[in-house]
Structure formats: C-alpha cells, structure tokens
A protein has these predicted regions:
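Membrane-proximal lumenal/periplasmic loop motifs of glycosylation machinery
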Residues: 45-51, 71-76, 216
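Generic structural signal for helix capping and beta-alpha/helix-loop junctions
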Residues: 52, 104-105, 283
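Catalytic-site neighborhoods of secreted/periplasmic enzymes
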Residues: 58-155
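Active-site-proximal cap/lid insertion segments
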Residues: 2, 13-26, 126-161, 169-320
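Short, hydrophobic/glycine-enriched beta-strand segments
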Residues: 5-11
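Generic enzyme active-site microenvironment
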Residues: 10, 98, 276
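Short glycine- and hydrophobic/aromatic-rich loop-to-beta-strand nucleating segment
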Residues: 57-60, 304-306
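Short, structured active-site-proximal loop/turn typified by the sulfatase FGly-forming signature C/S-X-P-X-R
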Residues: 4, 20-56, 62-63, 92-96, ...
C-alpha cells in the first residue's frame, strides 16, 4: 500500500443484533453484511462506556473516558487531550471528520466549529446541518411523527448529506494518505428516514427477550428512576416490540454506508475500513429504553468489522 488510507465509519445506537451478519436474518443490512464478508467481524466487541460522549472520547483520544473528561454527554474533552485527528495531522496524514462529533461540550448538535486537527473544509457536525435548514425544517428533522405526515426525502436527511461529503472527499483525495471519519447520527432517534425504509418493518415484531419481563425489585435507585417512564407494570407478557422507525432507520443508514463503501472501492480500493457503533439500545430489556449508566449486554455489545488485511473471518476474542 503506497499511501496510508483509513476510513472509519461509525453509527449511533446500533445493536449487534440489528445486523444480518451478526445473526439476525430479519434485519436488512446488505452493505454491512457485505463488509463482514470481506473483512474481520468481531463477535465480542464492547464499548468502553455505553453513552455517546464517553464512548466517542475513548475512540478518538485512545484514553479511557475518566482520563479525558469524557464522563457524560455534556462534557467537552480536556484542553490537554489530543484527538487522533491532531496526532495524525502532525504526522502529515490528511484527517477529515464528517458527521456527529459530540465532544466539544456543547449541546447534542455540537457547536458547528471544526475541532482541532481536522480539515475545516469537510467538518460537518450536526450544528452545521441545522444551519442549512429553515426553522420549520429543523423542527421536522427532530420529530419522528414527521415520517407519517410528510414525504421525507433522502436528500433532506443528515445521513445523506454526510455520505455526499464523504464521497466527495474520497474522490478528491484518491492520491493522498488520509484518515476519514464518517460519523452518522443514525439510527439514533428520531430515526428520520424515507418511508421506503421504515415501511419495510411495518407490523414486524422484534424478537421478545425474556429479560423484558424483569421486575424492578432489587434494582438500584437510578435504575428505577430510569425505568419510570417506560416500565410496563401490567400485561408485559402481551407487549409487542414493533420499532419500525428504529429498524427502518437502521436499514437506511446501512444504505448510506453502502454508498461510501462503493466510493471507497472506486477511489481507495486499498484503504483499511473500520466500522463500529458507539453503543446499543435497551429496547425494553430489563424494563429500560435507550442507554445509560448500566453494563447490560444490549448497550455494551457493539458491532465491529475491519476490512483491509486480506482476511475474511470472525474473531471470537473480547475487544474494545
């Protein structure tokens, strides 16, 4: 490999059992399934902490969250902590970050300012996306109900715009060494995606885990507070888990990733490609939703696939 080229693709809130290649045939994820067939699929990959900012702080600094001020979503990295973009840029590697950042101490969407070490021409955090929208469009972009009321086009979504920038970067930097991050917010809520994706799961019931019947007895106080709004006190045996928007967005981001993989094959066929997610989602297991201060398998076990070493296999060892 004459040039050093690495493409790091990350999603948000994507469980391992939401990918076909991890043993869930009902999930329509052909792009990532293809990547798994061409690389190494890690069976026991775990996040350092199952919350967005802490998980990302570990990935992009190489430090544990408690060592770089990555304790919670509202924290920014310590001033004395260098991210991988800074370190690689100092070594002459063109580093670009496209997508959700969540490490600047701002709100969920970021500050819209390029972080140290990355190419400002390609910086595109979620604040940058919101600045492109009208006030009405901003509201629609954060409401799950928008998908029922309006014809959401692919071009309107954050995922599509991240993909377009990634493809542009790959085409224009085909002859250079680079480190490209493509960080999708999807399939994190509000699960915005075109109808053709969420309608694929209309009426589909996600497998019912036995631990969805757990009670809150003997659980710590924070667990009970977390479960307060979602705890199904009655008739939980009859509860049907039908997250069509979540699963639809899961297939949508796979579709967008597929376009990046195709561009990589054309413009950077020798690139190392790494794919993972920051954490999973409880999906009512243990009476909980989303993610948070717990170490349950549903939120700590993450997908991890690496292509670029001429190997096609699964790795059974624990990694993080």
């Amino acid at each position: 490999m004459d040039k050093k080229k690495v493409i790091f693709i990350m999603t948000d809130t994507q469980r391992t059992d939401m990918l076909g290649c991890y043993g869930h045939p009902d999930m329509k994820t052909p792009s990532l399934d293809r990547l798994a067939q061409e690389g190494i699929r890690f069976e026991k990959a775990y996040t350092t902490q199952p919350v967005c900012q802490p998980a990302r702080s570990a990935i992009f600094t190489g430090s544990y969250p408690h060592s770089c001020a990555g304790w919670s979503n509202c924290m920014g990295l310590s001033d004395n902590v260098q991210n991988i973009g800074r370190r690689l840029t100092d070594q002459g590697i063109h580093s670009a970050y496209i997508g959700k950042w969540h490490l600047d101490g701002g709100d969920y969407f970021g500050l819209g300012r390029c972080a140290d070490g990355w190419d400002p021409d390609y910086w595109y955090d979620m604040r940058c996306y919101l600045e492109e929208l009208t006030e009405e469009e901003r509201y629609l972009s954060r409401q799950t109900e928008s998908m029922e009321k309006y014809d959401i086009k692919e071009e309107f979504t954050y995922a599509h715009r991240c993909t377009a920038r990634a493809m542009d970067f790959l085409e224009k930097n085909r002859d250079d060494s680079f480190f490209l991050v493509v960080s999708y917010d999807e399939p994190h809520g509000p699960f915005l995606c075109p109808k053709e994706f969420w309608s694929m799961y209309d009426g589909y019931e996600f497998p019912h885990k036995a631990n969805m019947l757990d009670t809150l007895e003997d659980k710590p106080a924070h667990h009970k507070i977390w479960a307060k709004d979602t705890y199904m006190a009655a008739a939980r045996e009859d509860f049907k888990l039908q997250p069509k928007y979540y699963l639809g967005c899961n297939s949508f981001v796979d579709y967008e990733i597929g376009k990046v993989l195709d561009a990589a094959e054309e413009y950077a066929p020798d690139a190392i490609i790494i794919y993972t997610s920051d954490h999973g989602d409880m999906l009512y297991s243990h009476s909980l939703t989303s993610k948070g201060p717990a170490m349950y398998e549903e939120i700590t076990h993450i997908p991890l696939i690496i292509k670029g070493f001429g190997e096609n296999r699964t790795d059974p060892h624990p990694v993080s």
